[in-house]
Amino acid sequence: MMKKNNSAKRGPQDGNQQPAPPEKVGWVRKFCGKGIFREIWKNRYVVLKGDQLYISEKEVKDEKNIQEVFDLSDYEKCEELRKSKSRSKKNHSKFTLAHSKQPGNTAPNLIFLAVSPEEKESWINALNSAITRAKNRILDEVTVEEDSYLAHPTRDRAKIQHSRRPPTRGHLMAVASTSTSDGMLTLDLIQEEDPSPEEPTSCAESFRVDLDKSVAQLAGSRRRADSDRIQPSADRASSLSRPWEKTDKGATYTPQAPKKLTPTEKGRCASLEEILSQRDAASARTLQLRAEEPPTPALPNPGQLSRIQDLVARKLEETQELLAEVQGLGDGKRKAKDPPRSPPDSESEQLLLETERLLGEASSNWSQAKRVLQEVRELRDLYRQMDLQTPDSHLRQTTPHSQYRKSLM
């Protein structure tokens, strides 16, 4: 509930209370208008008390008898008044009291002239402070009872220490599954801030006990899986007796936890039997691929090849004879001519030269065909030898392996 405070109102005070002293009093010159030749300035006694400004022609002790009274709530500010082009001493001591530009405000602007610039600054500061108090007078008159105070919703609330909530079991299992170590798994996920002697410690201890149990179970299952994976290869390797690995009978043996093997190390630990079986499987696979291969094209029979060779040889001889005749004919004609250095311009000579060139090309082609047929004959003989040697070599290769395996078993 809001009510007005009557102590700030103007009016006669109670008999028991003494009147407050004025903030500032003194003589200043007030601007009273302009005459014919100069400005009119008159000495006035000014009293500043509260939010009222009293102006009198003579010094008066009781403010009630002063006729000029101005309410400072109608004014906006007090500031220095100086003309830029004036060199007079009065220019440094003038100050004005400007009224506020509110509608209906009839307070006049007041212009004063202090005794000195220091006195001017003192009056400006005092009047500005009084104007500020006058504008805040309405707010100062309002008081609020203690019973009507608004209750703050969180001011008196108890402060609680908020710690991080513990991780869920699903999160713990996910972290444990991605862990690479078989030892202890430590998760510092609980932030202990001033724990109470009973509840927080017990909660943290129970959480850590559950975590240790889950980690121990996970590590045990991993060790069992690794031992089951490594045991068959270890049994096969132990079946082969190695004399250099025999230990003394009196020596004690301390069992150790099996070591995890990488994929590359697992490939290196294969037994001898597995290597031999893989080799036999590879050889059987090669034989199967050979059987599935398409048959090689049949080579010509020896009779056909010999007939082709005879034909090529006969054609080569005929071509060489014709070439020799043409060369002899051309040499005879060249010797019979008188001018030995004349170029062969006649058509017969050109025809002879062209015939000689063609016969030379034919002779070279027949020679190349003869060489090709000879190579074909050699390849046929080589294939025959390979076909005869393949079964015997296969039997020779398989027999030592089987005997060696029998000796190892």
UniProtKB/Swiss-Prot annotation:
Pfam families in alphabetical order: PH
The protein, known as: Pleckstrin homology domain-containing family O member 1
PROSITE patterns from the UniProt entry: PH_DOMAIN (PS50003)
Q: Which GO terms describe its biological process?
A: lamellipodium morphogenesis; myoblast fusion; myoblast migration; regulation of cell shape; regulation of myoblast fusion
Provide ranges: composition bias, Basic and acidic residues. Answer: 331-340
**Residues covered by region (Interaction with ATM, CKIP, IFP35 and NMI):** 136-308
Q: What is the effect of changing R133A?
A: No effect on binding to capping proteins and loss of phospholipid binding
Native species: Homo sapiens (Human)
User: Polar residues bias: where?
Assistant: 390-402
Its annotated compartments are:
Cell membrane; Nucleus; Cytoplasm
Please give the annotated consequence of changing R155A: No change in cell morphology and actin cytoskeleton. Great loss of binding to capping proteins. Great loss of binding to capping proteins
Report the SUPFAM superfamilies cross-referenced here: PH domain-like
Q: What is the effect of changing W123A?
A: Disruption of membrane localization and impaired interaction with CK2. Loss of phospholipid binding. Loss of phospholipid binding. Disruption of membrane localization, loss of phospholipid binding and impaired interaction with CK2
Positions where Phosphoserine occurs in the chain: S227, S271, S342
Q: Which UniProt keywords apply?
A: Cell membrane, Cytoplasm, Membrane, Nucleus, Phosphoprotein, Tumor suppressor
Q: Where is this region: Negative regulator of AP-1 activity?
A: 308-409
Please give the annotated consequence of changing K135E. Answer: No effect on binding to capping proteins
- Region (Disordered): which ranges? 1-24, 218-267, 325-350, 390-409
